[in-house]
Regions:
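Hydrophobic transmembrane alpha-helices and their immediate loop junctions
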Residues: 1-259
Length: 259
């Protein structure tokens, strides 16, 4: 019997970037199609959709290439409805390595946003299509960078917070603190979403969805940290399955090694 997954794969390979396979999940394909249709103009919609996809790839490459500089390799990058995911084969263990790996993605997004702003203000750009694409790229990458710095898992900000806290305590306790901070933010975000729904504002359901994701992934990350600590106390090798960015992927099997 042929498995349906083999007949209808969840994602397709679109290219290789710096030797890293890049896949496109079908959930994002649907979003990009709706994105194109929503703009009314096929040319503008397609341009903005491509700018979005390329910006996410650049963001994830920031994680992947920084990790590579520390000797940690990336299996692939997958773009999905919830954003990008760089699947690291092994995770950085030192706090400063995790900090730089996590912060690299938002840093790339801010650099792209800054370059788009400089192009708009200091280059002789007059064509309407070029101006709109640059303007959209500027704001899109700025929002992408800020969103990923939110202090909770699975966003980069959660890992940045944990890496800083790890300097003063154990990794497990730092993960717990990051989870609590993230859940506090998730509660505020959920309340904001409920208020938007009641008052007829925008992004209400999206805010609640993000809050739920932060709540769930924070606990999952903490459980992983506890299992890792338990395994190391017995002198066993540790492997885990994770999914939140910047780590994870399709099979989500990751080796965590000690340098």
């Amino acid at each position: 019997m042929v498995k349906l997954r083999a007949m209808f794969p969840r994602k397709i390979k679109v290219c290789d970037a710096f030797g890293i396979p890049v896949y496109l999940d079908f959930s994002l394909i649907i979003l990009l199609v709706l994105f194109v249709m929503d703009f009314g103009s096929f040319v503008y919609g397609l341009s903005f959709a491509l700018a979005l996809a390329l910006s996410i790839v650049a963001h994830e490459l920031g994680h992947a290439l920084t990790a590579r500089a520390f000797g940690y390799h990336t299996r692939d990058i997958t773009l999905s409805l919830l954003g990008g995911c760089a699947s690291l084969i092994s995770l950085p263990r030192k706090a400063w390595q995790e900090f730089l790996t996590a912060i690299a993605g938002p840093a790339v997004s801010f650099v792209i946003s800054g370059l788009a702003w400089l192009s708009l203000n200091f280059l002789p750009v007059e064509e309407r299509w070029t101006v709109l694409v640059l303007y959209y790229t500027m704001w899109m990458n700025f929002v992408l960078g800020c969103f990923n710095l939110l202090p909770g898992f699975p966003m980069d900000g959660g890992r940045v917070f944990r890496s800083v806290a790890s300097v003063f305590t154990t990794r497990t306790k730092a993960t717990y603190i990051a989870m609590i901070v993230g859940r506090g933010f998730a509660i505020l975000l959920a309340l904001r979403g409920l208020h938007s729904i009641v008052t007829g504002g925008g992004w209400g359901f999206i805010s609640i969805l993000i809050a739920w994701m932060i709540w769930r992934e924070g606990y999952r990350e903490y459980q992983m940290a506890r299992m890792e600590e338990s395994a190391r106390s017995w002198g066993n090798d540790w492997s885990a399955r994770v999914s939140p960015p910047p780590y994870g992927g399709d099979d989500d099997e990751v080796e965590i090694r000690e340098d």
